[in-house]
């Protein structure tokens, strides 16, 4: 399924698509030693590391992050690609949660203040903690960064 999703992103994208793995991400960013050590020791999940990578890449380079499990059925609209910041908002049905900004597709220009603040909050959190406080943690920090800016 993941390969089908990746193929759909390549098919419908009019911009270069960079597929990341543990090795290729090192060409673009260097994670701090304490974060890498926390991850390799098992005190940080793959999802948490992915969030730090996502925010770091977007803050530095800008662009569009699409999770590997997103199946595109058409081109990404220009209004998304031309935005300084774009994220989908979702009320999650009846779930009581103040975080409504999703992270599975994010777009930003380089050095976007919302992405930068979310990145800084995520790194500060993981430097001091060893487990995620809530499944929607990343949505929460995106919501906070968005509301503050």
Feature names for model-found ranges:
Residues 51-63:
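Small-residue hinge/turn detector
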Residues 1-51, 68-149:
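Glycosyltransferase-associated regions of secretory-pathway enzymes
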